[in-house]
Amino acid sequence: MILKSILTHLKAVKWGAWSLVCLCLSLVSGILVALHYAPAAPYYSTTAIDLLVPFGQYFRSLHFYSSQLFLLLTIVHLLIAFPGTDSYTSTQWGRLVVALPIMLLLLFTGYVLRSDSTGSSAGFIAESILMTIPLVGAALNNMLFSITEHGMQRVYVTHIITLDLIWLALAWEHLRRYRIRFSDYLPLAGVACLFSVFIAAPLDPEHLGVTYISGPWFFLGLQELLRYLPPSIAGFIFPAIFILALFFMQKRYPFFIQILLLLAIWLFFYLILTLMALYR
């Protein structure tokens, strides 16, 4: 009874609307940060935003934390609303599935643009992984990253334009179902804004003698797997299995139970890898 009551209360929460509010906060604060960011001197400009631009550190923190909240609330929204996704056509569901890795790439490129020890390492690892993908790897790297040749210029455009437009195109049909009044979600917005006042967004300078650098929290499992498997398997094939399985996560397919089991095993394995990376 207690579990059923908890589930009922969770379903009553408008997780989708909450995530949309966080998306709005992320977009507004991101525009303000982007105005002062210089791809030619990424780490210097990030530091200058924190130290020299009036309220710069606050808006960078708000952009960072509202983006993280957007991802987390979207995941919760997906889990809670999943039983209702059977009404979606394969095309509608497929677009939302593709929107998920695009969302992760948006957050990931945000980490890379900091160009601190975490961002620089993450960027070069991503570039190396893409270059191992047969046929299309070099083209994808040239379109999304190309850090070795162009520094942060390509990543900057990818983060503020390319991925945003792709994600909006994929999710627009779903987003327009929601009509939110920002005034109804002032407590959530207030928490995000207040949290950003007291907790600054991370910025990790280079430290001599440090041999292990943790990447973004949502990619820690992949980072750990790269220690044991080739980049093409750990960085491309392994996550591709999860995305492909999601495509068939609708009850209309006869192998729904098998896909559900595969996803559960994948997530459990990824959780173990993430914990290993956290305690390394």
What do the PLM-derived regions correspond to, one by one?
Residues 1-280:
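Membrane-embedded alpha-helical bundles that constitute the cytochrome b-like, heme-associated redox core
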